């Protein structure tokens, strides 16, 4: 949606290369409810995809993937690494303090500030504040950005609870990139000065 993009690469047996754009919400709902078994996806010339798994079969109307907007290329300069479990836990402990409405855009996001090898995550809605500090290893560059709450909610759904699995976070002036397993999540940052 130009604010948030998620890309995941999975291994599969490809009979014929192709590209199609499907409604992400519908596709993920179908896949989430399928049994844990092999899934077959077939697409016809009218951009209708048939998803089959065991006795389940679904048809989804799609459109040409040629016009699909891909994730922006992020220059990986400023970065930090931490466990997926730690990031997931941090989001869950702070996200409730973000504002659900857009009256004050800044309060719909969380501050991610890296200073002196500590990541400080702050959620604030005008009535409550949640702060979490995480010690980082290595030499992290100082960073101060505001990440949309919507992005953090989506990330917390797909992060592993495994303390051994790592997430790399890259910062630019306009975007943040979360990279873990075979997944990349890119989000625009909220512009402005956090309180």
Language-model features: locations:
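Structural preference for solvent-exposed beta-strand-turn elements
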Residues: 1-195
